[in-house]
């Protein structure tokens, strides 16, 4: 399947999902979440895949949720932040986060759910939602 907000590649026994919204710092919108969920399901179902690598295009791994969608989808977004981390945690295959820049909010939650994080010297991790009076939704502070 062709995706719009992620790049999903398989080579040999390795799958790579690249969050691909560099103009939005790879912020997670509804479409990106749905595409990621579908690709992760394919990774789980494909017996030839032995490991999954998650990364981001441009200057970010994932800069959290797309706050432009908060006004209409607050409860949906909160549920799906948890769900993305749960999807990563429940995969039966090892998941590596290759963090190449900003890894914030929901992106940090996704990375923390991985089995291994490899971070470049430019990687920056954080939970900026606390500055908005919002508790990190994916459980990263619990």
Q: What are the roles of these predicted feature ranges?
A:
Residues 1-57:
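Conserved CoA-thioester-binding segment of acyl-CoA-metabolizing enzymes
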Residues 22-25, 59, 64, 102, ...:
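A short, glycine- and basic residue-enriched loop/turn
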Residues 41, 48, 56-90, 103, ...:
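Glycine- (often His-adjacent) and acidic-residue-rich active-site loop
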Residues 84-90, 98, 104-142:
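CoA-thioester-processing core
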Residues 17, 54, 66, 110-112:
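Hydrophobic/aromatic residues within transmembrane alpha-helices
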